[in-house]
Regions:
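Beta-propeller domain segments
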Residues: 2-127
Length: 127
């Protein structure tokens, strides 16, 4: 599920925005699989090797392919992919004066792991 232009919700565990969900179709229960996503576009589940590949639109540039390790689901620390704190992309309009407050709140660090997030398998800039 995307962040619906409410960036901060991608890092809020109480919100479903910016999360990948596992939904039980028999009882409609759900489980958060991962968080920190901007705009997920596609999922591929490799049942044999127990992983998910997720494609995601970044902001201006910074599209991602993320590896979600299914065997880590349910561990104490949820897999977090960093949005809106880390991204290979930039905010639309770049680092202009009008975007100054946006970058202060959502800096889009180029490293994910340096800030405690899972690094994408691949990023595409420009995209």
């Amino acid at each position: 599920m995307g962040d619906f232009r409410s960036r901060h919700l991608a890092q809020n565990i109480e919100s479903l925005n910016g999360k990948i969900l596992k939904i039980d179709i028999n009882n409609n229960n759900h489980e958060i699989i991962s968080m920190g996503h901007r705009n997920p576009q596609g999922l591929y589940f490799d049942k044999e090797n127990n992983f998910i590949l997720e494609t995601e639109h970044g902001p201006k540039g910074g599209d991602e392919i993320n590896l979600i390790e299914v065997n880590k689901i349910g561990e104490d620390k949820l897999q977090n992919y960093g949005w809106p704190i880390s991204s290979a992309g930039e905010h639309y309009g770049g680092k202009s004066e009008e975007n100054k407050k946006k970058y202060e709140k959502y800096p889009l660090y180029k490293s994910h792991t340096e800030y405690g997030f899972v690094e994408p398998l691949l990023t595409f800039t420009p995209s």
